[in-house]
A protein has these predicted regions:
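A general structural signal marking secondary-structure boundaries and capping sites
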Residues: 70, 119-123, 165, 182, ...
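Conserved hydrophobic "DFG−1" position in protein kinase catalytic cores
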Residues: 100, 134-136, 141-143, 216-218
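CheY-like receiver
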Residues: 119-138
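Positively charged, aromatic-enriched patches within helix-turn-helix-type DNA-binding elements
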Residues: 95, 140-205, 210-212
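Glycine-rich nucleotide-binding loop
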Residues: 35, 211-215
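Intrinsically disordered, low-complexity protein-interaction/activation regions
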Residues: 199-200, 218-220
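N-terminal/domain-start alpha-helical segments
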Residues: 1-123
């Protein structure tokens, strides 16, 4: 899950970024509306977490711009403006959810997951594939009664492959889905994660297509 965080307050932004990353999400952090516009024009996101009180372009103006370009990416507004009138105004402008400051990070994470599930037409975070049951929130895979623990990166990679089953994904595409702007990436990071998943889940789950990328085949 790739999230665009738009927040100008360094302290709040850092805390939210850390919390979302710890929950297994990939986060790009824009500190103003213009920077967020550029990000949205160049990168596909599963969710936008948006503060309304931004420099250069207000959060309300950015939200209006997002919807006018027919971008249906879910938007969660977080703001200190938490009167009923403010909430109604934000939702009417196109926000999908509204969270007043201060807030609990666990609630923010839960709301983020719920918005993405809803946008993808899913009622639960868990993903079934063959005899596997993947739980991105708990970073686990169940095979029958066996519980297999994954790192947050391994889980995010597996979810990306399962969401695109039958379609090969390049190493660059997988890197984009797993790493934010400011994160350093080892040149062989994807290969290492793929190797770990094969060791934990079986060598046949993920197929390498030389010169193209990796794929999890559709179930037959």
């Amino acid at each position: 899950m790739r999230v665009l965080l738009v927040e100008d307050d360094r302290l709040i932004g850092s805390g939210v970024e850390d919390g979302l990353i710890e929950a297994g999400m990939t986060v790009d952090w824009a500190c103003d509306g213009k920077h967020a516009q550029l990000a949205l024009e160049t990168t596909p996101y599963d969710l936008v977490v948006l503060d309304l009180g931004l420099p250069r372009m207000s959060g309300t103006e950015l939200l209006d711009w997002i919807r006018k370009r027919r971008d249906h990416t879910p938007v969660l507004v977080m703001t200190a403006r938490d009167t009923v009138a403010d909430r109604v105004s934000g939702l009417s402008a196109g926000a999908d959810d509204y969270l007043g400051k201060p807030f609990d990070l666990t609630e923010l994470v839960a709301r983020c997951r719920a918005l993405v599930r809803r946008s993808q037409g899913r009622s639960t975070d868990t993903i079934e594939y063959g005899d596997l049951l993947v739980d991105p929130e708990r970073l686990t895979v169940m095979r029958g009664s066996e519980r297999i623990a994954l790192s947050s990166r391994e889980c995010a990679l597996l979810v990306e492959l399962l969401a695109n089953r039958g379609r090969p994904l390049s190493r660059a595409r997988l890197q984009d889905s797993l790493y934010g702007w400011n994160e350093e990436i080892e040149s062989n990071a994807i290969e290492v994660h793929i190797s770990n998943l094969r060791k934990k889940l079986g060598a046949q789950l993920i197929r390498t297509i030389r010169g193209v990328g990796y794929v999890v085949e559709k179930e037959t």
